[in-house]
Amino acid sequence: MVVLVTSKHEDKHNIMAAGFHTTIGYAPLIYGVSLRKEAFSYDLIMNSGNFGINFVPVNYAELIQIVGTRTGREMDKFSEYNIEYDHGINLNVPILKEAYFAYEFKVIDSRNYGSHEFVAREVMTIYKDEDKFIEIDGWTMPDMNKLEVPLYLGRSVYATFNASSEQKDYV
């Protein structure tokens, strides 16, 4: 699953796609994302120490592809592609209005692993469209009857994960 990384430093902001990301720990909630040092977003994130991660529905797959293949050094992607956002509550990073789930992060560590820098960060704020989630056995899970999630297959190809996708419970 590809997420949209949003960043802001001083009067500059940017949005980019990231396919390498994961939860690292829960107490406190730590999340990591791999970024190329050459990316404009990397500069903004390292200078501000903050950024956002946004999960968007499948109707944004084309936007994910576009913002992931164009640099913010040459254009304001928010203006160019009419991307609506609010300023984050705690860290003032862009949080997409159409995100069904989003985080605001404070950078706590960064390490180089070849072509990418793995940036670990502490979650400062969580945004969730409550209507798009359900509780199952004490776990909050996406309600796939209300969501269609884009899954990146590679080479600009996306699939849709939704309620009609095969799902199995192996418990």
Feature annotation, model-predicted:
Residues 1-171:
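Basic, polyanion-binding surface patches
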